[in-house]
Amino acid sequence: MDKEETIVTIVGSVLAHEGAEFVYAGKAAECESCKVAKVCHNAKLREGKRYRVVSVRKTKHDCAVHEGGAKAVEVAETIITAVIPTSQATRRTRITYTPVCDDVFCKGYAFCHPDGLTEKGRYVVLEVLGPYSECPKGTKNLKLVEMRPVPT
């Protein structure tokens, strides 16, 4: 697997442990007057993307958004498990993601719309986990895969 690029940012102390995951939601109004907002909202972070904490630094900050303060951490974009058409499911292939299904009431919706995946976003298929035959709608020729966003 490729060496993952890490980004230094600041997260609430509750999330500041290795392995914690979050979806970056952008700045809150309270961030405008914060001295460390530039680090917290690092220009490399992308709204709607899922990140995983890979290491925690000792630095702690007061925070108007996070009760209990915030800590400096290193994060990497998370590997995302999703369902895609078999025709796109080739290891190390770059794809433009389009959800297979848009029915929010479907039991399989979370596989078609996992947190951190963006419609029309560019991703690399890392692993093909196998066929996905559990589609409640009966859609055929689907695979369950692990993907990572294409670095920008």
Curated annotation (Swiss-Prot):
Question: Which parts form a coiled-coil structure per UniProt?
Answer: none
InterPro entries linked to this entry: UPF0179
Disulfide cross-links? none
Query: In this record, what's one Pfam family?
Result: UPF0179
The family classification in the record reads: Belongs to the UPF0179 family.
HAMAP family membership = UPF0179
Protein name (record): UPF0179 protein Mlab_1307
